[in-house]
Amino acid sequence: MNKIAKIAALAALALTCVASTACADFNADKSITVISREEGSGTRGAFVELTGVEQKIDGKKVDMTTDDAQITNNTAAMLMTVAGDEQAIGYVSLGSLNDTVKAVKVEGVEATAENVADGSYKIARPFNIAYKADGQSDLSKDFVAYIMSAEGQAIINEHGYVGSNDAAAYAGNGAEGKLVVGGSSSV
């Protein structure tokens, strides 16, 4: 059985609309270059759902991303593509934001961890940890406990995501070994 630990307080994914830092050179007479993530990307899925780009048609969810969108396959490529085109707009996780692009205000609200935490920045979703609950190793349990601890949450906050400020201190269970972890390019 798979278990998903929702980490709403741990790491709200603020899907931040980003534009080139060269926006002073933006030409309103030119077309905007839409940059999107690949189909199947969790970041894309959240973005289209939260912004209304995903619509229900005949009872099925349909991603209405423009066919003209340039597609990138990871966060770094999204940032590089947007940074290289002053007419471009795309989206990344808040914690992935860097100085090569700038966040676009949504409904007049800046994309900050504080605004995500207080709910005023609306384009946000939780990150999740998925693992097998049956037969979970002591090492795996310890890793999840660390992530959810005050120390783990501090790392989340330091990287621009939204962590919980009321988590308990990490106690640890003394487990040692090798743990293989996979996940999103958004973190």
Regions found by a protein language model. Give the residues of each.
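Exported/periplasmic ABC-transporter solute-binding proteins
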Residues: 23-187
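Sec-dependent N-terminal signal peptides of Gram-positive bacterial secreted proteins and lipoproteins
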Residues: 1-25
